[in-house]
From Swiss-Prot:
Gene behind this protein: moaC
Species, as recorded: Halobacterium salinarum (strain ATCC 700922 / JCM 11081 / NRC-1) (Halobacterium halobium)
Role noted for this protein: Catalyzes the conversion of (8S)-3',8-cyclo-7,8-dihydroguanosine 5'-triphosphate to cyclic pyranopterin monophosphate (cPMP).
Lineage: superkingdom: Archaea
Stored CDD domains: MoaC_A
Gene Ontology BP, a term: Mo-molybdopterin cofactor biosynthetic process
Disulfide bonds: none
Protein name as annotated: Probable cyclic pyranopterin monophosphate synthase
Length: 163
C-alpha cells in the first residue's frame, strides 16, 4: 500500500497544471532500479524462441537491444521524466514453459531515480518479443487469444547516498 500523501504530488502546480519536478538542489546519488514483467506465449512459440526458429531472427538478442535503447530514451517518451545519465543496464530473460520473463536493472548516478527507465526497458523489451513472434502467435482470425503482457512492476529501488 502506498504511503505517499496525495497532497504532496509534485508533477502538478497548485492550479493543476503539469510541471516537471525541480531536482536541481538534490545531491548526485548512486541509484538502481529493477523492474520485470512476463509475456505469455503458446508452448510452440516458446519452443521456437528456444530453438532460434523464429524467421525474423534471434528474438532475445533483438529484444535485449530494444530494452536497452528504450531505457536510454525514456525521457523522450514519458513527458515529466528527466534525462538522466545511464551508467549501466542489465537485461535478463527467463524463458519458461508458457512465458518469457524479462528483468531490467538500471543504474545511474544523479538527482532522480531510474525506475521509469527500468519499466520502459521491460515493456519495450517484451513488446519486441511480441513483435518478433506475432506470426506464430496469431490464431486463424489474426487475433492473439493467449498472448499477454502481465505482471509489469518495479521489483526494487535503491539509493546509495555518498559518504
Amino acid at each position: 500500500m502506498p504511503d505517499g500523501d496525495d497532497d504532496a504530488l509534485t508533477h502538478t502546480t497548485a492550479d493543476g497544471d503539469a510541471q516537471m519536478v525541480d531536482v536541481g538542489s538534490k545531491p548526485d546519488t548512486a541509484r538502481r532500479a529493477v523492474a520485470s514483467g512476463d509475456l505469455h506465449l503458446a508452448e510452440s512459440t516458446i519452443d521456437a524462441v528456444r530453438d532460434d526458429g523464429i524467421g525474423k531472427g534471434n528474438v532475445l538478442a533483438t529484444a535485449r537491444v530494444g530494452a536497452i535503447q528504450a531505457v536510454k530514451h525514456t525521457w523522450e517518451t514519458i513527458p515529466m521524466c528527466h534525462q538522466i545519465p545511464i551508467t549501466n543496464v542489465d537485461t535478463t530473460f527467463d524463458v519458461r514453459d508458457d512465458r518469457v520473463v524479462l528483468e531490467v536493472a538500471v543504474e545511474t548516478t544523479g538527482k532522480t531515480g531510474c525506475e521509469m527507465e527500468a519499466l520502459e526497458g521491460v515493456t519495450t523489451g517484451l513488446n519486441v518479443v511480441w513483435d518478433m513472434v506475432k506470426a506464430a502467435e496469431k490464431d486463424a482470425d489474426g487475433q492473439y487469444p493467449g498472448t499477454a503482457i502481465e505482471n509489469v512492476g518495479v521489483d526494487t529501488k535503491e539509493k546509495h547516498h555518498p559518504e
